[in-house]
């Protein structure tokens, strides 16, 4: 009975190791395929950065208002 219990525990441990290592190996494989694969630059959305440059600088009146607000 002890031997069967030990074999069961060892089998459970090995199955856990196998399932966890499969997840790690798939994550590593996905990372390598992203690093070594062809990057698709045709569908790159650069329009998201246009909003950064459309905004005017903060005016002196706005700065004065913010300074008064934070006193």
Curated annotation (Swiss-Prot):
Compartments it resides in: Secreted; Target cell membrane
Tissue specificity: Expressed by the venom gland.
The keyword Membrane is annotated on this UniProt entry: yes
Organism domain of life: Eukaryota
Annotated signal peptide: 1-23
Residues carrying Leucine amide: 36
Keyword entries, A-Z: Amidation, Antibiotic, Antimicrobial, Cleavage on pair of basic residues, Fungicide, Membrane, Secreted, Signal, Target cell membrane, Target membrane
Prosequence residues removed at maturation: 40-71
GO cellular component, one term: other organism cell membrane
GO biological process: defense response to bacterium; defense response to fungus; killing of cells of another organism
Family, per entry: Belongs to the non-disulfide-bridged peptide (NDBP) superfamily. Short antimicrobial peptide (group 4) family.
Name of the featured protein: Non-disulfide-bridged peptide 5.5
